[in-house]
Amino acid sequence: MRHETDPVARQALILATDPFRSGQRTADDASDVTGYLQQLAASSPHQSDRSAARTVLRGWGVELKAPSRDVSEVPQRLAQRNWWVNEQGITMVILELPVYASGPQALVAGREEEASAGPKSRTHLFAISSTEVSREQLLRCQQSFPFLLEGPEDHTWPANNVFSVVAMQYCRWLSERSAEGFDEVDMCYPERNRITTDHLQLSDEQLRKTSYRLPTEAEWEYACSSGTATPWSHGSSDVELLEFCCCAGNSRGKLFPVGSLYPNAWGIYDMHGNVAEWCHPAPSATGNYALRGGNYTVPTSRTKSRSLNYPGSKGYSFTGFRIARTILRTDSGELK
């Protein structure tokens, strides 16, 4: 795996070592591989192989060093790698979405017909969190919350029973406290007490703002597929899916800690299953809103990157969210 130059291919090789626990290898081999994976986990510029290294090391019981949360030089760092860790400990992964149409629906709807409309005219740079927002992270914003299902005391399960307004309020709270330098003009949403389900409708102007927000359906679908055209991001096998997805086939009626299964090729976890995630669509005629990715209660066939419509004003045991933000490139080529 050391000689592989493609980070996605290197990720696959790393994950293939996971079943071979240290007891099944010689002490020298175990030490050598562990040291290499620790190096990738700490400093790889690619979230693909970094995520695989962290996943395998956790499975081997190796304590991982917490990554730096100093975001004061994020733009400079982004020129060297495709991820950073914000103050809340959330890893953000930078992706570049091809855009095949003009107008806000090109970045909101995530419709397959837009992908077949012709050659791409531009790209949209954005970042999406590698994991769903955990209960611990949401509780930093809200002193208490009526989560459903009794989970572990460390609150590592994804936040659930979340409705869309709570998710947007968290994004606004995070943006207000971020050292990434957001001013009011950068905010996608108004003050927290003014956010309603109406703010799930995004304009082009709002999408150009760089504060934290929910992903659009197009962004979510692109991050989920991770460059594949198969039913699930890992391929077509519903048996192998259980290594990547918390669903009825393995959940036993419970959620999994965020990021505890295998990541997709771009280093993003739990895009299939665990909790369904609120996204920014245009609302349907019924006033319902988009949830993506299936959840812990459904069979594998319902964990694909499909869109489900539910009332945005209600939460369920299977509804949660992850965060995103637009990335801009300055005239000098710097990202911000």
Please provide the spans of the model-predicted regions.
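Amphipathic alpha-helical scaffolding segments comprising HEAT/armadillo-like alpha-solenoid repeats
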Residues: M1, G23-L40, E63-S72
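Positions within the helices of HEAT/ARM-like alpha-solenoid repeats
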Residues: T5-R10, P45-R50
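Structural signature of alpha-helical solenoid repeat scaffolds
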Residues: L15-P19, R58
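Short, solvent-exposed loop/turn and secondary-structure capping segments
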Residues: G23-A27, A66-R69, Q105-A106, R140-Q143, ...
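Pro/Ala/Gly-rich low-complexity, hydrophilic intrinsically disordered segments
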Residues: G59-V85, G89, R325-D331, L335
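A short glycine-rich, aromatic-capped structural motif
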Residues: N82-E150, H155-S175, H272-G273, G320, ...
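Functional-site microenvironments in short loops/helix caps that host divalent-cation chemistry
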Residues: E153-T156, S164-L308, G312, S317
